[in-house]
Amino acid sequence: MAPPFTDDPESQRPSTSRLSQDSLSSVSTTSLVFDRIQEEMDRDPSSSRSARRDLLSATKDEGDYEDASETGAFLGQPGVPLQRQPMDRGFRRILIIIGAVFVGAWLAGLGVFVLSGSYRHESDSEHDPDAISRGSGKAVTMDQVFGGFWSAKSRSISWIADPDGGDGLLLEVGTANGYLVVEDVRADKQGTDTTSRQTADTQPAKPRVLMKDPYFMYNGEIKRPEWNEPSPDLKKVLLAVNLEKNWRHSFQATYFILHVETAQIQPLVPDNVNAKVQLANWSPKSDAISFTMDNNIYIRRLNQANDVVQITKDGGPEYFYGIPDWVYEEEVLAGRSATWWSDDGNYLAFLRTNETAVPEYAIEYYIQRPSGKKPAVGEEAYPEIRKIKYPKPGAHNPVVDVQYYDVSKGDVFSISAPDEFPDKDRIISNVLWAGNKVLLKQSNRVGDFLKVILVDPSERKAKIVNSINIAEIDGGWFEISHTMTYIPADPSKGRQQDGYVDTVIHEGYEHIGYFTPIDNPKPIMLTSGSWEVEDAPSAVDLDNNLVYFVATKESSIQRHVYSVKLDGSNLTPLTNTSSEGYYAVSFSSRSGFALLSYQGPKIPYQKVISTPSIPIEFSRTIEDNAGLADKAKKHELPILKYGTLQLPNGISVNYLERRPPHFNPKKKYPILFQQYSGPKSQTVTKKFAVNFQSYVASSLGYLVVTIDPRGTGFLGRQHRVVVRSQLGVLEAQDHIAAAKHYSSLPYVDPSRLAIWGWSYGGFQTLKTLEVDAGDTFSYGMAVAPVTDWRFYDSIYTERYMRLPQDNAAGYDASAVHNATALGMSKRFLIMHGSADDNVHFQNSLKLLDYLDLARIENYDVHVFPDSDHGIAFHGANRMVYDSKSEFSVLFSWILSPMLTLSGLNNWLVNAFNGEWLKIADPKPIDTKKRRHVS
């Protein structure tokens, strides 16, 4: 389950009186007058009326009516002239001296005010995420967050292999030289060249223009490509037009082939120009393209005119070839391709998926018609129904196996290994060509037993080379990843036999192991320690036996880039580990160059650097986000406080506390707890982000706290796997313990604590409210929540919960079903899209039924018609966060505050303002009294 990308409007900030010793701009003469009046009133309550009266009289125009009650005794009676008495000279001299001192002090203060620049609503200093206070600037607004105002600019480099054996080539789109251009990264002049030292034999390669214009003509029609993939020899380009989105990653489109030298265009499917193709991939030799159409797999051979070979023939609604079905796309492959060419182009491996026994789930569309088909006459009023093969826990999974196509012989075959998992208990997560062999990873359906299988297609044999019982190791599960990398033998480089590098469990943490020979079940450990690698390896330099990876070695909430030798020696950072940082990285085809993306905690930037793999020194900043830095100076961003919280239950969790820009420890603040909490997820990081949480802290003036409870990632396996078979239960305990800790702090209002989340975070919100039963949290907001894990997909759920048949008590304990306990909170909000193909609307409806049965009424619901898990149809995403309309603005003073309950922003403000308590027990107005008053 991946959180949707969502990854906010101006709201009135609560006014607070603050006295700053550093800025005269924070105190006006008027405020001092009011303070003085208030002091006198506090001393003598009887004077309050006259003080107010004097202030009022000072604002009246001449000729305003004054009644006798507005005159004081010292003024004399109306109509009686005032009797003036001469002032003592000594007293007058003292007053003059005091006045002169006051004027001098005022002028001095004015000079300091002007010279210090305190009148400017910005800071001249660089954004400091560790600052303990903020300057006088603008608040973060919801419009800024939704409009991309705070989005860091970044360049996505598409590294591309050099057919001539070089390195550092990238594919640029929309350059001055042409629409598709292959450039040498060293020749890119769009950045600041900070360091560049290279020899004559390492000079940048000349650019190659693959496509001049951003469109092409075919049969007299202008077509604009929406996707492209150059052939490995860079002589042709696959172009896709008319994309139609399917699921999270997949789409179908019409494909064309561009011949670079002649600019000739031809359709991928010669006899069906407008064919809708689901996937197309180049062969390594650039002489063929495999593609899937109507769930069957084909090969288009380019060395023969109009030569299309259909490899499979039984593809259709229940059989998929070369592409994943819904659950494999979402939970296993995390992509749209299930086709793998051998390095020599002689074999094509592809996944066959049999969904015959998988139950269907129907999704109704009330507004739109995703199929694009017009309803039959007379049936226009009926919703369109889309049926998805969606396996739920305990139901039939799709049956998958890998098939192979021998290009020279033209035959298709399967290869089974002795003792591999049976059809009903098999998940295939990895397919990797290792020379002329294939490495497969299979696990059982609950994901706690892994088998690595080595397949030899030429001999048509397979054997299991490694079996890992993860349930026996730590009681947890196998984490799916797609970074396993083949290491070919090269005696000249000290590699006597083939092998591979992969992430393995080592002493309670995830580290990198090197398996050689390739059938050796015991790896050479390249990393170790009380820290973890992430999606490792990032790249492998075969020329220098170097493995590059990203890890949490410095801190669990930071990411730095490192290299290590294949023998486990010489672990070296590529990034500056003496300074806090969260880096992402991508490498060129031969690992000689890297795109470093610094993502925080300071303003993000990107630079291309040379690596230890090449003998030159190169560094160029390609994005410094100077504009974002300037915005940060001019705005009051939240104060960020990171740390480790020791909970009473003995558990340590990372936390992030976002404080209002002018945090006052003497005030009492409400807290919004924001979280996701899913297995191996991480929300507390050192990334720079200005988002909805930032808006809440900056503009609404609330505290926003996030913790990563047990079950989340990068604190070791034991911290993570302890939640197995009982999702949500321990996490709820941790959130409640954290909230109780905060409730005890002097600057927190314990009566105003709320929690919110989306997807898994929505589930965790409701589960926490249920377990807490109103003891700690008063409010909660859940978006697209799971409420019973029996309703989610099988592959994700069973990995953490096992089968319902084997863990019925665990499923019951995890489900949100105690409506009475849930109703003990002051109020909660549920939001869901009716066409959610991921977390079905069924989840929220089941919970609503529990609430009806228990007669619980202190909640609100907002359903978004035809929205999926991201809730975006017809502008719904903005509505999730803020639903204030012109109608509600104009008439909210007449109507109930229920009018603006739907958006998270408005709902939260109503909650912390106590509005929901006012309507908790509504009473009818006495009509007799109303008539009497009128």
Curated annotation (Swiss-Prot):
GO CC terms of this entry = fungal-type vacuole membrane; plasma membrane
Reactions catalysed: Release of an N-terminal dipeptide, Xaa-Yaa-|-Zaa-, from a polypeptide, preferentially when Yaa is Pro, provided Zaa is neither Pro nor hydroxyproline
> On the Vacuolar side, which residues?
115-934
What GO MF terms are annotated?
Answer: aminopeptidase activity; dipeptidyl-peptidase activity; serine-type peptidase activity
Enzyme nomenclature, EC number:
3.4.14.5
Q: Which residues lie on this side of the membrane: Cytoplasmic?
A: 1-93
Active site per UniProt? 759, 836, 869
Which coarse location class describes where this protein primarily resides? Answer: membrane
Write the record's keywords in alphabetical order, separated by commas.
Aminopeptidase, Glycoprotein, Hydrolase, Membrane, Protease, Serine protease, Signal-anchor, Transmembrane, Transmembrane helix, Vacuole
Superkingdom of origin: Eukaryota
Entry similarity comment: Belongs to the peptidase S9B family.
Could you tell me what this protein is called? Answer: Probable dipeptidyl-aminopeptidase B
